C-alpha cells in the first residue's frame, strides 16, 4: 500500500470533505473529476478552483460521449429533476446507469498510472436507498475486482460508507472546512434550488449540525 490515493472529486460536499480528509491523514492526493454530461456541470468549476488553491493535482476527464449509452437520468437527459427527499421513489430518476462502475474503473487506471494504492469515493449511508452503486456490497465487489484487474492491486474505498451526510459535515467542520467552496444542487442554475434531493439532504445536514449553509438558495423546500 502506498501513501498516495486517487479521490473521485465531484465538487460536492461529500467528496470535498473526503479530499481534505485524505490530506489530513498525510496521503498524497490526486483529484479526478468527470464531465459525464451532468446538468450541474458547474460543480467541476468549483472542484477546479479548490484544487488550484490547494495545489492538488487535478484532472477532469470528458466522458460526455458515453451519455449516448447512459441515458434516462434526470441528471444527464431532458428529464425534470424530482423534488423531495432521497427516500422517495421518484428520486430513482437521478440514477445515471452504471455511473460509479465506469468512474471507478477509469480512476483505477489512473491510480495504476500514478502509483496510487487506492481510489476513494464519497458514497455514504444516505445514498443506499436510491443508488445501488453506493451500497456496501457494490464497494466490496469493486474492491475485489480492482485488486486483481492489473499487476498493481488498487483498493476501492468509501470511507463514509457508514455515515450520513450530517456526520460527514461534522467531520469537515472539525477540519475547519469552508463549504462555500462546494456545489451540491442537481440543477445547473446560478443559485441552488433548495428543493431537489441533493439540496434537501444538504440542508438537513447543516441543520443537524446547527450551522448555517453558506450557499445561496432560490427558495427553501
From Swiss-Prot:
Binds 1 zinc ion per subunit. Signal peptide: none annotated. One of its GO terms (biological process) is queuosine biosynthetic process. Its EC number is 6.3.4.20. Its cofactor is Zn(2+). Keywords: ATP-binding, Ligase, Metal-binding, Nucleotide-binding, Queuosine biosynthesis, Zinc. ATP binds at residues 9-19. The keyword Ligase applies. It comes from the Bacteria. Zn(2+) binds at residues 185, 193, 196, 199. GO terms for molecular function: ATP binding; ligase activity, forming carbon-nitrogen bonds; zinc ion binding. PANTHER family: 7-CYANO-7-DEAZAGUANINE SYNTHASE. This is 7-cyano-7-deazaguanine synthase. It comes from Marinobacter nauticus (strain ATCC 700491 / DSM 11845 / VT8) (Marinobacter aquaeolei).
